[in-house]
């Protein structure tokens, strides 16, 4: 008996379009399904990346929702450092974790962008993600390209109910339709099982 795929992970090199793909899929399905979650948006000033913002998926696609700085090169004096960025742990708590906890109760599709080194610095983030993955919800998540180097991430990606897609410059134009189709089929299956 095959396991129903309801968790879709997208990985790929930085800048390849993971967040864009997730936003496009969420936007295409937003009026048909209850969608909640968050994205991590790169912020540039004068062509140079200065940090990342966390925002609700609804905010990311032009509707209302919370946002805050996840990390910045100079804005924060305290907090853990990853590369040149200081990470704002309170944004992970106030936006990512809070949204995921709400989404488990209310959403059909839960968007998690990204499961990566910055987000994993918060001790509650991984247990919250595991709670989401162990729910019956459909999940569309991006995972850091180096997930294989972290046993915690590798365990998430290798679940029998998960499908991993690696986004590249060569396949990214076709991958949107493939991911959208798979997510929509999982959502239809979820809806049928709840009827």
Regions flagged by a language model, labelled:
Residues 21, 25:
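Hydrophobic positions on the alpha1 helix immediately C-terminal to the Walker A/P-loop
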Residues 77-131:
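Phosphate-binding/switch loop-helix module in NTP-utilizing enzymes
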Residues 18:
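Conserved lysine of the Walker
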Residues 10:
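Hydrophobic anchor at the beta1->P-loop junction of P-loop NTPases
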Residues 7:
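Walker A (P-loop) ATP-phosphate-binding motif of ABC ATPase nucleotide-binding domains
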Residues 27-81:
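N-terminal phosphate/diphosphate-binding loop that engages ATP/GTP or pyrophosphate donors
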Residues 13:
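P-loop (Walker A) phosphate-binding loop of NTP-binding proteins
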